[in-house]
Amino acid sequence: MATADEQEEEMRMRLPLPLGGRVAIVTGASRGIGREIALNMAEKGAKVVIHYSSNQHAAEEVASIINNKSPSSGDGVRAIVCKADVAEPSQVAQLFDTAEHAFGPLHIVVNNAGVTDSKYPTLAQTSDEEWDRIFQVNCKGAFLCSREAAKRVVRGGGGRIINISSSLVAMPIPRYGAYTASKAAVEMMTRILAQELRGTQITANCVAPGPVATDMFFAGKSEAAVEAGVKSNPFERLGKVEDVAPLVAFLASDEGEWVNAQVVRVNGGQV
């Protein structure tokens, strides 16, 4: 005879998953925030395309975790990987083609892929090449993926475009000029896109994390710089990827439909 806990778990498993039947692309999903977003969405029922640009092994590891720990839906493979340069239109189109071929119509696109300059130069010290590199991935990449999503994501309900920005846009900090400018552009682009998608029931929002304990955050920072980030937060800690992913999944769900054209800053009250 099943225990009370076992009965409760069985009942929970029978409940419809909030992202059940949905298909999602998550860019930059091989590590960091993107990895956790992909894992969280899969746990909530979505089939997920794990996009990566260089680290195939890490991307395949994420897909393996999802496929080895699938909800009891019996629908086979629920995650695949796909390499693409998000700043190249043809490769972005191929990414979407791959997703549709594997899983059918798309519902959710999370544009998370991003880069920064771990040397943290001032604007006066920022090279043309570095400025262009950051804008190519962070801004053009988000634009190309959002443009493709606007054409391909399902209409009539359940369509979601979620761009990952940064709380730095709301707190201009020296030596993040190119990165912050690229994310500011993404925020305004997203708000305009939401208005242009009027009548489709596709929502477009930004999630803007504060400092999160990822490889990208730690790269090039001294212990003192990290500690300063910790102390500046009311919680006196860095954010965790687990602080961000559930919010993204909420925006992707039916419950998040009335949130549209918004920038949601998730930073523990830092700004």
Curated annotation (Swiss-Prot):
Alphabetized UniProt keyword annotations: Oxidoreductase
Highest taxon, organism lineage: Eukaryota
InterPro entries: NAD(P)-bd_dom_sf, Sc_DH/Rdtase_CS, SDR_fam
GO MF assignments: oxidoreductase activity, acting on CH-OH group of donors
SMART domains: PKS_KR
Binding site for NAD(+): 25-49
Active-site residues per Swiss-Prot or TrEMBL entry: Y179
CDD domains: THN_reductase-like_SDR_c
EC annotation from Swiss-Prot or TrEMBL: 1.-.-.-
Oxidoreductase is among the record's keywords: yes
Binding site residues for substrate: S166
Sequence similarity: Belongs to the short-chain dehydrogenases/reductases (SDR) family.
Protein name in the entry: Short-chain type dehydrogenase/reductase
Species of provenance: Picea abies (Norway spruce)
